[in-house]
Amino acid sequence: MFYSHLLFFTFTFACSSSLNRKTKREMDLKDIILDTCHQNAACAHIQMHLKETYVDELCKCGRGEECPIHWDPNDGHSITQAYNQWKFCSPISQDLPVCTREQTAREFSYEMNPVSKKVQMFMFFNCLCPENHFYEFFNEREETGGGQLAIIEERCEKVKQCEKTQICQKIETFQGKFLFKHVKCFCPGNQNCNDDLKKADATNVGDDGSVQHYMKCH
């Protein structure tokens, strides 16, 4: 099945005809194509951890426009939620409605480029998840026409309160640089989820050299 799942803070791409799940960093360059953005598609995703940011470019702007890949919630080209920011080639409406529980919040369109025969993903927002919610996969539609392979749909799911000793977030670094954070739950009461990598409750080194830092509430 052609499937890709984005949990609020991590991108996973289904790429090429093999339809294997790989992170963008794990793909060979021949598997990746940054095509011209469709209208209203996000051109980049930025995450901030303390003062460090990581940029994941999603597509290229056309008509002489550039994707504004610097953190700026006031540039008129951004949707900002917590330490996530999505960028757009053209000014984006700041009046997107808050999603209802049953509404499709975000869509990913996977398409085959007719020239290169490589897969490109485009991301579209229909509405914004409310505070303490994340974007969660709920439906996949396989397509057969117009070069489109599949559409992934996400809804808003509430982030649950952490249980005692539960990991509240995972932060990944590569060669000492921040890549992304994945929040798993929110800390109760006056507790906060640890952000200090030096005080991680556990770490794991991946085959590609990336390091996962597992944090608990303190």
Swiss-Prot record:
- What Gene3D superfamilies does the database record attribute to this sequence? 2.20.20.160
Compartments where found? Secreted
Keyword Cell inner membrane in record = no
Q: Which domain of life is it from?
A: Eukaryota
Query: Which GO cellular component term is one of those annotated?
Result: extracellular region
The record's account of how the chain is modified after translation: Contains 8 disulfide bonds.
Q: Which UniProt keywords apply?
A: Cleavage on pair of basic residues, Disulfide bond, Ion channel impairing toxin, Potassium channel impairing toxin, Secreted, Signal, Toxin, Voltage-gated potassium channel impairing toxin
Signal peptide segment: 1-16
**Tissue range of expression?**
Expressed by the venom gland.
- Residues forming the propeptide are 17-25
User: What molecular functions are annotated in GO for this chain?
Assistant: potassium channel regulator activity; toxin activity
Q: What does this protein do?
A: Voltage-gated potassium channel inhibitor.
Return the similarity comment.
Answer: Belongs to the scoloptoxin-11 family.
- What's the protein called, per UniProt? Kappa-scoloptoxin(11)-Ssd1b
Species of provenance: Scolopendra dehaani
